[in-house]
Amino acid sequence: MTTLSISRSQTLTAMAVRLGAFAVFVAILIYFAVQARGFLSPFNLINVVEQTTILGLLGFAMTVVFIGTGTDVQKGGIDLSIAANAGLSAAIYAVLLKNGHGDPVAALAAVGSGVVVGLLNGFAVVRLRIMPLLATLAVMNIAAGLELTVTENTVVGASSPLLALLTSGRFLGISSLAWCLILVSSLLVAVVHYSRTGLRLYAVGGQIEAARAAGINTGRYILGSYVFSGFVAGVTSILIVSRLSASTPGTSLLLLPILASALLGTV
């Protein structure tokens, strides 16, 4: 079998998986539309979008890592630390608010924490050349341990004007959380598909040697994908606190749903 045949086979397999996932989604949608009155009402659809905001944003971040590094377990990339990173950032945000710091300081600290974790992942993968699976697994354990240290393994309540806006704010009848998912996902799709950066990211993840031969700084794009993942985890941590009015242990349990949404979905 030629290289071209293998490439076509892999492409067809990937398309089949994605179309299959979409078909299942449509089937579930039709089932609930028939069985549950009001399921397709605007109020319920907006509520569904709001409920999936956190998972959706983290799933998009993981997808960017897959695009920029590939999905091969050994040669490709993955960010197993993304859920723990969001949990750590949420803990930092809630603790700072509880200690009297305002939204600007707490939010910057949360996002900064996420970016630092992303940088650590990227450094381990690009510079130290550690297998992404092992590198991000180690960082995941570090982030989870730091979260327990920061919160002392307790629920940390939080309230602020920003959290109130995210919780109860609405525009055109759509909640702030739903707008976060709509705007970020639209922007991400536009950047990944129609910008020079997005096309190069696809090139690096698809054929890294060819991308390197074309003069693309592959290490920079791989590092950037992990930093972006960390940035999104930091931003999403604020949304997590807004939904729960607290930072709670257990955010790392989102990892499997995030992986499923990234592997079966598409950007």
Enumerate the language-model features and the residues they cover.
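Hydrophobic alpha-helical transmembrane segments
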Residues: 15-23, 48, 81-85, 93, ...
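Helix-loop-helix "hairpin" substructures at the membrane interface of multi-pass membrane proteins
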Residues: 102, 116-119, 173-247, 259
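Transmembrane alpha-helical segments in multi-pass inner-membrane proteins
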Residues: 69-72, 230-233, 243, 247-267
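Alpha-helical transmembrane segments within multi-pass membrane transporters and channels
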Residues: 97-140
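Hydrophobic alpha-helical transmembrane segments of polytopic membrane proteins
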Residues: 60-66, 113-118, 184-186, 257-267
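Single transmembrane alpha-helix segments in multi-pass membrane proteins
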Residues: 31-36, 43-99, 128, 266-267
